[in-house]
Regions:
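Cap/insert and terminal regions of metallo-dependent hydrolase folds
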Residues: 170-227
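Active-site-proximal loop/helix segment associated with metal-binding centers of metalloenzymes
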Residues: 16-18, 124-193
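Active-site neighborhood of phospho(di)ester-bond hydrolases with catalytic His/Asp-centered motifs
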Residues: 35-39, 59-69, 93, 163-169, ...
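Active-site metal-binding motif and surrounding structural segment of the metallo-beta-lactamase
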Residues: 42-91
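Active-site neighborhood of divalent metal-dependent phosphoester bond hydrolases
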Residues: 84-88, 96-122
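Conserved beta-strand hairpin/beta-sheet module of binuclear metal-dependent hydrolase folds
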Residues: 2-50, 150-168, 184
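Short Pro/Gly-enriched beta-strand edge/turn motifs at strand-loop
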Residues: 2-11, 106, 133-138
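A short helix->loop->beta-strand "cap" motif at the edges of active sites that frequently abuts
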Residues: 32, 84-88, 215-221
C-alpha cells in the first residue's frame, strides 16, 4: 500500500471464541495510526501486542457503533491512556461517546476518571463530518443501519489514494457516493455464501463473502497493494 497499510487485529463476530472480534489499525506512510473499533474486551491488548503495536502508539481511534463486540474493548484502550498518561482522541457519533463516557466514569478508578478530558478527548461526529489523523484525512458517514446508529468512513492518504470502510453491515446504495471509486474497500462478510444456511447472516444484517466480491468491482475498487 505504498507505505500505507492495514493491520487486522480481529475478524470474528460477537460470539467468536477462537479469534478476536473484528477491529483493525490503519497506518499511514508517515507512521500515524488510527485504531478502528476495539472488540469486546481486554483481548485488544493481547492483539496489539501480537501485532507488534505498542499501546502508546495508539493516539486516535474511531468507533463505528455501540455493539458490545466493537465498543467494550475501547474501555481498555481509554484506561491504558489514562493509567500510563498519554493522549488519546476518540472519534464517533453521540450515542457511542455518551456510552463511553458513562461507562468510564462508573467503572474506572477515580484517579483515572479525573484525567478524562485532559488526556482523553471524545470528539462527536455528525453524518459527513471530517477529521484528520496526521497525514490522513477522514470523512465519516451514516451507513443507514436499521438496527443501530452506525458510521463508516473514508480515509484519504497523502498520496491521494482513498480507502472506504463500510462499517459492520453490507454495502448500502445510499452510501455509494463514499464507496464509489475507493482504491481499497473494507466490506464485512459474516461467512461464505456456501455456509449461508448454517450461519444465517441475512437475519443479522450481515452478508457473505460473495456479496463482498460482487460489490467490489461494481464500486470500481481495486483492493490491491499499491506498487
Amino acid at each position: 500500500m505504498d507505505g500505507n497499510r492495514i493491520t487486522m487485529l480481529g475478524t470474528g463476530n460477537a460470539h467468536a471464541t477462537r479469534c478476536y472480534n473484528t477491529c483493525f489499525a490503519l497506518h499511514s506512510a508517515a507512521g500515524c495510526v488510527l485504531l478502528v473499533d476495539a472488540g469486546g474486551g481486554n483481548g485488544i491488548l493481547s492483539q496489539l501486542e501480537c501485532a507488534g503495536l505498542r499501546k502508546e502508539e495508539i493516539h486516535d481511534l474511531f468507533v463505528t457503533h455501540a455493539h458490545t463486540d466493537h465498543l467494550l474493548g475501547v474501555i481498555w484502550i481509554v484506561r491504558m491512556a489514562l493509567q500510563f498518561r498519554y493522549s488519546l482522541n476518540a472519534w464517533s457519533h453521540a450515542k457511542v461517546l455518551s456510552l463511553l463516557d458513562g461507562i468510564c466514569r462508573q467503572i474506572l478508578p477515580q484517579k483515572e476518571v479525573a484525567r478524562l478530558g485532559d488526556l482523553v478527548t471524545f470528539h462527536r461526529l455528525e453524518d459527513g463530518g471530517t477529521f484528520r489523523v496526521g497525514d490522513m484525512s477522514f470523512q465519516c458517514f451514516d451507513i443507514h443501519s436499521s438496527k443501530e446508529s452506525q458510521f463508516g468512513f473514508t480515509a484519504t492518504f497523502a498520496n491521494g489514494l482513498r480507502l472506504c470502510c463500510l462499517g459492520d453491515e453490507p454495502f448500502n446504495p445510499l452510501c455509494r457516493e463514499y464507496a464509489q471509486d475507493a482504491y481499497w474497500l473494507m466490506h464485512e462478510a459474516f461467512c461464505t455464501y456456501a455456509d449461508r444456511e448454517r450461519f444465517r447472516p441475512y437475519e443479522k444484517s450481515h452478508s457473505t463473502a460473495r456479496h463482498a466480491r460482487t460489490d467490489t468491482p461494481r464500486l470500481r475498487s481495486c483492493n490491491k497493494n499499491q506498487q
